[in-house]
Amino acid sequence: MRMKKLALACALVLGLQTTSLAQWKPAGDRIKTEWGEKLDPANVLPEYPRPMMERKEWKNLNGLWNYAIRPCGEAEPKTYDGEILVPFAIESSLSGVGVHLEDSQELWYTRQFEVPAGWKGKRVLLHFGAVDWRAHVWVNNINVGKHEGGYAPFCFDITDALQKGSNKLTVRVWDPTNNGPQPVGKQANRPQGIWYTAVSGIWQTVWLEPVNENHIASMKITPDIDLNRLRIEARTGESEWKKGCRLEAEVYDNGKLVASGAAVRGEAIDITIPGEVKLWSPDTFFIYTQSTPETKRHRNGCGGQLCSHEKVLVQA
């Protein structure tokens, strides 16, 4: 009986979601493109969002979220105004809303999500490709972080805020456009002439990523063409690594290992590529692939692999 009730509940939720997707439509047809015409609200921007540091496991949170517009300073609304298609700015046609956000207003988002069962024991990172301009983020009503800046990606470790089953994600955004403290471009609250319509709220992919406690957070790769060398600097996600851990980098040419190097945490890895280096140019679109797994030394465990991959462009 319990299983029947659970199956019925799941069917109802699926039915509601299907109906909601079927009801979505663009708000007008401004600046319509062939890609916009083919947009599937159930599969929005499915491409991996960080091609320069790719991991196999991730979960896309793009799609229909609930939204509300409220005066600045108010608490989270008990009821929301409707649905918005993330990651399109609320002013855009593809958001399904297409309204202007005043500098005296805040834009609220919320949705439910579940963490895949296979991620048990991992740290879970919540990524935003970009949110314009100031974003406050909560998971299950727990404040997980704040970010300012409309163009830079950011992420928060939300592991400690998660619960079993469904989780609630809430985002509050304030975007004063040309009336705020941020550097001003050509977006304007009253667009005309050369002044553009503002781009407010979430406007790049939102996604989840499982990582080990010891993981690579970011990488910087500097080529030295004269010496046929790459310098790789990695920033790790933990301030204290277990003893014996180090970073190892491998460079591949169409799947074939051509060079490798290693260094302890905090030090750069210098890798010399043997033979004639294949340089990238507009005429020869060659790309080396660089993989950075975690390695172990002696008997000390390092807690699994970091599993990071990056494309290396060596320009002529």
Which role does the model predict for each range below?
Residues 2-5, 9, 20-316:
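Secreted/periplasmic carbohydrate-active enzymes, especially glycoside hydrolases
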Residues 13-14:
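Repetitive helical segments and hydrophobic/amphipathic motifs
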